[in-house]
């Protein structure tokens, strides 16, 4: 078999893996969106659907990881290709954790519904929806950057990460005020604080994806690096 033929096969295998990563990304993005919908509408059926699909997310991580190991064992990837394979491994781990956060939100919804909180108290769930919209947009942008290995778009994700953190801080203050003003809301407000934290972590995982993309293209590890320094790397 010629070297060119082997190279073409390898490129096809890399393309197939990247396609599976994007498929997994689309699934976890949908999981987060549905979990938040379940929360804002106190919809037990949607929450249950999210939990039913959690196993599929975990299965995809295992399958893609297995394929990665197989490629590394059979091929001799160049430095950049090896960086891509490493980045894919990190990416699917982050996506699996996003799926975990979606499941955590869904379980919280079921608990709130089962305790009757949704009918007894007026909770600030709409504020959580805005934070979630930001996090989902970040995740979508990071996946788009992954599909194109677009460092400029990855940099945008890093720049916008603080906005989600600020939303979380604002929600935390609001929920603390809720608890102080009405002790009946303490238990449910604590649940919503954990939901807000789960949403913030979705943004953190999107940031991790963006950093992995820059690592693939530029060969520089930009974790724990200021946005200003990352800009210099991307230029």
Q: What residues fall within each predicted segment?
A:
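Cytosolic, long alpha-helical scaffolding segments
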Residues: 1-235
């Amino acid at each position: 078999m010629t070297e060119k033929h082997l190279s073409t096969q390898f490129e096809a295998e890399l393309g197939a893996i990247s396609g599976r990563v994007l498929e997994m990304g689309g699934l976890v993005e949908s999981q987060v969106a549905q979990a938040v919908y379940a929360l804002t509408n106190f919809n037990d059926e949607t929450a249950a659907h999210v939990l039913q699909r959690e196993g599929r997310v975990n299965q995809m991580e295992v399958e893609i990881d297995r394929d990665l190991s197989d490629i590394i064992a059979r091929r001799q990837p160049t430095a950049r290709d090896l960086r891509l394979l490493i980045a894919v491994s990190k990416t699917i781990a982050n996506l699996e954790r996003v799926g975990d956060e979606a499941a955590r939100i869904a379980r919280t919804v079921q608990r709130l519904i089962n305790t009757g909180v949704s009918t007894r108290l007026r909770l600030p769930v709409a504020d959580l929806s805005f934070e979630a919209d930001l996090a989902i947009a970040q995740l979508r942008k990071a996946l788009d950057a992954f599909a194109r290995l677009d460092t400029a778009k990855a940099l945008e994700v890093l720049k916008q990460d603080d906005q989600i953190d600020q939303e979380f801080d604002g929600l935390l203050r609001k929920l603390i005020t809720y608890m102080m003003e009405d002790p009946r809301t303490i238990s449910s407000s604590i649940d919503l604080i954990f939901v807000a934290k789960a949403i913030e972590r979705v943004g953190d995982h999107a940031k991790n994806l963006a950093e992995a993309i820059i690592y693939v293209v530029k060969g520089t590890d930009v974790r724990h690096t200021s946005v200003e320094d990352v800009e210099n790397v991307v230029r």
